[in-house]
Every structure is written in structure tokens, then in C-alpha cells.
Amino acid sequence: MSRPQVTVHSLTGEATANALPLPAVFSAPIRPDIVHTVFTSVNKNKRQAYAVSEKAGHQTSAESWGTGRAVARIPRVGGGGTGRSGQGAFGNMCRGGRMFAPTKTWRKWNVKVNHNEKRYATASAIAATAVASLVLARGHRVEKIPEIPLVVSTDLESIQKTKEAVAALKAVGAHSDLLKVLKSKKLRAGKGKYRNRRWTQRRGPLVVYAEDNGIVKALRNVPGVETANVASLNLLQLAPGAHLGRFVIWTEAAFTKLDQVWGSETVASSKVGYTLPSHIISTSDVTRIINSSEIQSAIRPAGQATQKRTHVLKKNPLKNKQVLLRLNPYAKVFAAEKLGSKKAEKTGTKPAAVFAETLKHD
């Protein structure tokens, strides 16, 4: 990160004299691919098992008519006097029949995720919260935020009234993001409307605390605002929808505890046997590396630029003499000397004739 120090702001929005060093986790590589892979797997683990009824599609009496009637052998509803009689039943191709391969509750619902991969994704999501461009690209209204990452005094953890908590968020510049959430509430499209998912709305700021002294209850009824403990940060909250750049408000105690949780060059992580991931190259400016004197002295100079013709007309060398000479320069001498029409010279008598003459003399 380009910011080695972060200023702590009071609950009134004023900058204090405290300046905290940036924790090492914010220098972790930002890997959207790993975050997306881990998110899609972890997000499946909270699903509730569902299945169709075992009796669905079979709650009727139907028998096949057998062969000889020039109709399909599918079971058919008996009786008469109604349109249902004679109709096919049970099969998945029939109206009112069961589905193909009915769903079962013993499906494998959970997905195993590598422990280190999950930690890598969480560290990347934390590092992305400190990049203002990613936070803006995710849709958060942080134009009036003093700085990112935003660190607030630890007094925020002791607030027990929702009115006071909302006033503190407004004071630090998060009011625009709260209004965005309120205006985004819309009726869900689809069948989720009558499956207890009737409304949709955007995500607001995530408040990370070190110790809950009332902040969780104070903010739990504010639309879009979520809370999380710094010791158990969740990827589903840090990167909702696998989109990096969640707007996070850190308390001072939580911000200073990040090095203890994730570790640094001097402090060991509380996670057993874990070390923070590091970049493959220390300098992200690849152009500067390529143009450096050390690299330029070791590579050969660029040759002449070649321009590839967009369309090449292929010509037959057997019919086009210029193309033939380009492919085989010896063809000119071959034609001038008429070597193709000359007969091969006899080098001498055949061995069989010599052998016959020898026998005659003997």
C-alpha cells in the first residue's frame, strides 16, 4: 500500500493525533480468482436441504394398456366421463407426472475448501478494502470519507443506542452509503418473493470491532450495515457476491489487532502454522523493471520491424516461373542446359557381359 500510516477519527468525524501503522495483511496479494473460487464454494455451505415429495406424480391409479392398441405403453388413468381418463401418468414426459430423477435431501450440499486457500481469499479481501478504486467500483458511496481504510475511535464499540451509532456513522462520512441502501430496496424478481426472500437491497458498510460492548445490537437494525469481529472475519461479508472492495469501518482496537490475528514480519499469527501470502515480485511496476539498465543490458536489441501481409495469393510454382525460381533457383540452370531431355551416358560394359566373356575364354 502507498499509505504507511492511517489516521484515527473520533466519533464526531474529527481527525485525532493518533496515527496507526498499516497492518501487514493489507499488503497481501489481491487475487480475484481465488476469492471467486472460495466464495462460490463457501456460499454453498449455508444451503438448506430440499427435495420434492416422494409421492409427487404418483398419487393416481394408472395402468398400461399394453400392446396391440397402437398407443404408447405409458400407464394411463382409468375410468371415463372425464378428460383425465386415458391420459398418461407417472412418467416425466406426462402432464401431472413426476419429474425426472426426483431430488433427494441426501444430496452432497457442502463443499470442502482448503484451509490455506480460504485464508488466502480472506486476506485478499481485507487488502482490497484499503483500495479506494475497488471500493468505489463496487458501488459504495465513499466520496466524503476522509481516508480509506477508515479507522474510528474504539469508543464506537461501547455505543448501545441505534440513534447514537447512526449519528457516528454520519459524522465519519458514511451517510451517503446508508442512503444508497435505503433507496435500493426493491421487490425481488422471481419465485423468491414467496419464499421469504421478498425484498432485495444493496450492502452498506461493514463495522469491524475487537470487543462487543453494545455495538452489535446498536447496528443490527440499520439497513445494509453489518458487524463482524476482527478475530473471525468472514469472506462472505468482506466480499459479498465475490466482488472485492467492501466499505469497512475499523475500530482502533480492531485495526491494531490485525497484526496479531494475521501476523506480520515481526509478529507471529494467532493462526497456527500460517504465514501471510506475499507477492511474486516486490515491484508491481513491470514497465520500470523492463526498462531498467540491468535488464536492458542483458537483452539483445530489437530487430527490424516486419509487417505481415494480410492476404497472400498462393500461386502454383509449376505454372508460375517466378515462383518456381524463388523456391528452386537451380531450376533456371536445369532448363537452360536441358538436363531433363538428356539421356544418361553409359559408364561402361555391364557386369553380366563381362562375366559372359570370361566364361567364353575359359
Swiss-Prot record:
Effect of R98E: Leads to a slower growth at higher temperatures but allows RPL4 assembly into the mature 60S
Renumbered residue ranges of the record's region C-terminal-extended nuclear localization signal: 277-362
Domain writeup: The eukaryote-specific C-terminal extension harbors a nuclear import signal and delivers the ACL4-uL4/RPL4 complex to the pre-ribosome, triggering uL4 release from ACL4 and incorporation into the 60S ribosomal subunit.
Modified residues (N-acetylserine): S2
PROSITE patterns documented for this protein: RIBOSOMAL_L1E
Miscellaneous comment as given in the Swiss-Prot or TrEMBL entry: Present with 151000 molecules/cell in log phase SD medium.
Post-translational modification comment from the UniProt entry: N-terminally acetylated by acetyltransferase NatA.
Positions bearing Omega-N-methylarginine: R95
A Gene Ontology BP annotation from the UniProt entry: cytoplasmic translation
Identification of the protein by name: Large ribosomal subunit protein uL4B
Membrane-spanning ranges: none
Effect ascribed to mutating K315A: Significantly diminished nuclear localization
Source organism of the structure: Saccharomyces cerevisiae (strain ATCC 204508 / S288c) (Baker's yeast)
